């Protein structure tokens, strides 16, 4: 396999069918989630390096948070864009294995990797770098939920599940929430009214 064939094979990932049998996603969600993941990984690595440099201020927790954030950035970059690690053979097979998993697995992994650096060293660098990875996980989670039904399907489901069973919908002006409700009576004031 030539270098060009390998590169085009790695770049064609978002067009492939979902091998896990999940719902079909629109093209902008497939490519958008990949691009968001790549951008998130880049900024996580960059701001993780910034947190690692905080060892100058003797902040060990920020050092560890920066290392974890950089590792999370490398993992996200390897899973979203394995073409960036083309010299490492196992990255492609790991990315292929991850593509066979359901989308909620990837969403959970990204969200779980993004949380520890934020709690260990709360600051703009860890919040922005890990927050983008968390946002990528949230997008994958929403993709895992799938698209909602059409308006006609939701309307039909609401009519079937309405209270009262198979009652046909009424178009009467006086139709209320409660069936067989009597109108209010305007007979006058109550006898015990003091008229104050």
Curated annotation (Swiss-Prot):
The chain crosses the membrane at residues 36-56, 67-89, 114-134. Keywords: Calcium, Calcium channel, Calcium transport, Cell membrane, Cell projection, Cytoplasmic vesicle, Endocytosis, Endosome, Ion channel, Ion transport, Membrane, Synapse, Transmembrane, Transmembrane helix, Transport. It comes from the Eukaryota. It holds the Pfam family Cg6151-P. Channel activity is inhibited by La(3+), which reduces Ca(2+) influx and thus inhibits it's function in promoting activity-dependent bulk endocytosis (ADBE) in response to high stimuli. Homomultimer. Associates with the dally/ magu complex. This is Calcium channel flower. It comes from Drosophila virilis (Fruit fly).
């Amino acid at each position: 396999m030539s270098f060009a064939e390998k590169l085009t094979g790695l770049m064609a990932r978002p067009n492939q069918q979902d091998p896990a049998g999940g719902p079909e996603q629109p093209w902008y969600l497939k490519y958008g989630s990949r691009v968001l993941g790549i951008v998130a990984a880049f900024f996580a690595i960059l701001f993780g390096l910034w947190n690692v440099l905080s060892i100058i201020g003797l902040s060990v927790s920020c050092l560890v948070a920066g290392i974890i954030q950089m590792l999370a950035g490398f993992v996200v970059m390897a899973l979203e864009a394995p073409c960036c690690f083309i010299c490492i053979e196992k990255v492609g097979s790991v990315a292929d294995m991850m593509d066979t998993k359901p989308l909620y697995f990837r969403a959970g992994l990204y969200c779980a990797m993004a949380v520890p650096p934020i709690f260990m060293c709360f600051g703009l660098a860890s919040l922005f770098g890990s927050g983008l990875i968390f946002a990528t996980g949230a997008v994958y989670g929403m993709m895992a939920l799938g698209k909602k039904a059409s308006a006609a399907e939701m309307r039909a489901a609401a009519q079937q599940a309405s209270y009262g069973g198979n009652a046909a919908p009424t178009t009467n002006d006086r139709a209320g929430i409660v069936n067989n409700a009597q109108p209010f009576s305007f007979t006058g004031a109550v006898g015990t009214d003091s008229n104050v």
